[in-house]
Amino acid sequence: MIYQGENLSVDYIENGIAHLVFNAAGSVNKLNIATLRSLGEAIDVLYKQKDLQALLLSSGKSAFIVGADITEFLGLFDTPEEELSDWLHQANVIFSRLEDLPVPTLSAITGFALGGGCECVLATDFRLADDTASIGLPETQLGIMPGWGGSVRLPRLIGADPAMEVITTGKPKRAKDALKIGMVDGIVSRETLIDASVSMLKQAIDGQLNWQQRREQKKAPIQLSPLEAAMSFNVAKGMIMKMAGKHYPAPLTAVKSIEQSANMHRDDALAIENKHFVALTRTDVAKSLVGIFLNDQLVKSKAKQAVKNSEPVKNAAVLGAGIMGGGIAYQSASKGVPVLMKDIAQASLDLGMNEASKLLNKQLERGRLSGLKMAQVLSSITPSLNYGGIETKDVIVEAVVENPTIKAAVLAEVENEVNEHAILASNTSTIPISLLAKSLKRPENFCGMHFFNPVHRMPLVEVIRGEKTSQQTIDRVVAYASQMGKTPIVVNDCPGFFVNRVLFPYFAGFSLLLRDGGNYQQIDKVMEKEFGWPMGPAYLLDVVGIDTAHHAQAVMAQGFPERMAKNGRDVIDAMFEDDRYGQKNGIGFYAYALDKKGKPKKNIDEKTNAIIATITDSTQPYTSEQISARMMIPMINEVIRCLDEGIIASPAEADMALVYGLGFPPFKGGVFRYLDSIGLDTYLDMAKEFEQLSPVYQVPDSIKQKAAAGECYYPAPKSSVSSPSV
């Protein structure tokens, strides 16, 4: 053994050929700070080996290296700028020393080689992959860019255009696609990967492969004429501004870094990369996107624990077909859980089956599943007008009309048909679960399972715990949601649960802003283009359905009369009274017509302003800042109240529910990350200006206390860098 560290070891595999194996104690290899330090030590040892003729890098895991340890990122981001830059430089010295070893080097890649793992293999002369390999630089998806030489070596290896596509999209390349663009030199089977790698290194040792030339290519300037450079970088910047927009600076920064260093040799180019990487770590966007990643890991770890605590769901049922029931049935069946879809009307069953068939056809057209698989999924959905076979089902999801009397009757009826261990779950958007449970003999076997529309696209499922719901029931339904490929978040019961409870104060802010003379088109534009929502409130109401919102608004007002009861007729009432329900009937705030692809396209409707005029006295100009504040303060206040009341368990789960359920701008990270970013005192000052408008603008005492104590909602990160040395 030449070197033995906690996460990697080096020994000779054959005479003169050293073998460095990444093999961390955990389930996967991560290029964390400890592993990086160990890699530096191993390379120091290799430089001292007099008989060294070649070096092979491989993994003792099914994946090569999944990337850097993202749990260390926020600490790195909090490190003083100069200290982080020094540390980054020292880290790059390690990869440059790997690249400069006086012998040929090769990486044998299995599974993922992402982020720092990709940057590590780029430092070697050759790369062989097995057919499971997936190689890429996903850093821009976290608001940063490659910082260990990825943006320097990749464009020199494969050319500027393909390198910029890999880096700016953040999407990994499968082995065959990586081979096409030159990221790897060959693909072999996993069984022969090491032998083939050793054989290739022997060819390099014998002079049959010019490893020195490959190496020098990565250390020299990018081979581009001035005209080629101008065209390449200008086109890339234009595409990025169109795709990523102004809210996500990392892709554009990466391109600018590559452009500025294009005519430089490696070490000078690395210094440019260092400067741009450090600048991105100072942005709130990077902290927000990394925060989302970490929050997602927390939510998924809770779901995994629930899966461990319960038996997998083998058979399920949906009560109520139509678009929603068909969507739920499709999602269950497509993930391998057969489902009985029951309705009292054949037309509804036909609609549900058509919805499932339509979604499967889209997958077939895109080449994502075969005709055989489509037939298998469809055949695992059983439409029925009766309860026959429901006694064998593990979980039954009720998805009938949003009416408490009807839902309670259906639930009581089906409880008599199922086995005593079966779980009943109601797909309701606003009705309290504890209210529906009153009709049941076994309320402990009942919970809420709130899907978002469209089911196949929206990742979130709210799992709602009623007063008498057992933990076993919660675990089983969380496990079922996970089986369906969804992200389940457990919330406690109240009207609207979490997502809809915080959405309707946002709509209240919109109604009040229109009452006070705001322009709905300007509000939509500000909330989309400036704040970053995928849809403004008027457009969102049209998509949700103004009739649906009108009904839900009444439920929320009944549940929280002190804040959500309306003081007179509002714009939702006015639209509802004029039979403007939104996309579903072609007219709401906007008018809708189907485009060439059959999707509803919104157009300005001249009558909308006349309807709004019936609930306001005059029009008033508002700044973007005023609009954002008046729209967001009611939602933020309600999110804080939900945390205070234990409706949602943590800031992390609240933020993920907002991002996955409502499309809260990811670059802002969720309400609590946003509050920490702007500062609680800043928020309190902003809210104070509007507190007389309505009770929804009055901030909870808890945030005042937190601000007075100088606290944040997320714990302050600890610096991951203790010294510049690695």
UniProtKB/Swiss-Prot annotation:
Residues 1-189 are annotated as: Enoyl-CoA hydratase/isomerase. Pathway: Lipid metabolism; fatty acid beta-oxidation. GO terms for molecular function: 3-hydroxybutyryl-CoA epimerase activity; delta(3)-delta(2)-enoyl-CoA isomerase activity; enoyl-CoA hydratase activity; long-chain-3-hydroxyacyl-CoA dehydrogenase activity; NAD+ binding. The active site is at 450 (for 3-hydroxyacyl-coa dehydrogenase activity). It catalyses: a (3S)-3-hydroxyacyl-CoA + NAD(+) = a 3-oxoacyl-CoA + NADH + H(+); a (3S)-3-hydroxyacyl-CoA = a (2E)-enoyl-CoA + H2O; a 4-saturated-(3S)-3-hydroxyacyl-CoA = a (3E)-enoyl-CoA + H2O; (3S)-3-hydroxybutanoyl-CoA = (3R)-3-hydroxybutanoyl-CoA. GO terms for cellular component: fatty acid beta-oxidation multienzyme complex. Substrate binds at residues 296, 500, 660. Residues 311-726 are annotated as: 3-hydroxyacyl-CoA dehydrogenase. Its EC number is 4.2.1.17, 5.1.2.3, 5.3.3.8, 1.1.1.35. The record marks 119, 139 as: Important for catalytic activity. NCBIfam families: FadB (TIGR02437), PRK11730.1 (NF008727). In the N-terminal section; belongs to the enoyl-CoA hydratase/isomerase family. In the C-terminal section; belongs to the 3-hydroxyacyl-CoA dehydrogenase family. Involved in the aerobic and anaerobic degradation of long-chain fatty acids via beta-oxidation cycle. Catalyzes the formation of 3-oxoacyl-CoA from enoyl-CoA via L-3-hydroxyacyl-CoA. It can also use D-3-hydroxyacyl-CoA and cis-3-enoyl-CoA as substrate. This is Fatty acid oxidation complex subunit alpha. The lineage of its organism: Bacteria, Pseudomonadati, Pseudomonadota, Gammaproteobacteria, Vibrionales. The gene is fadB.
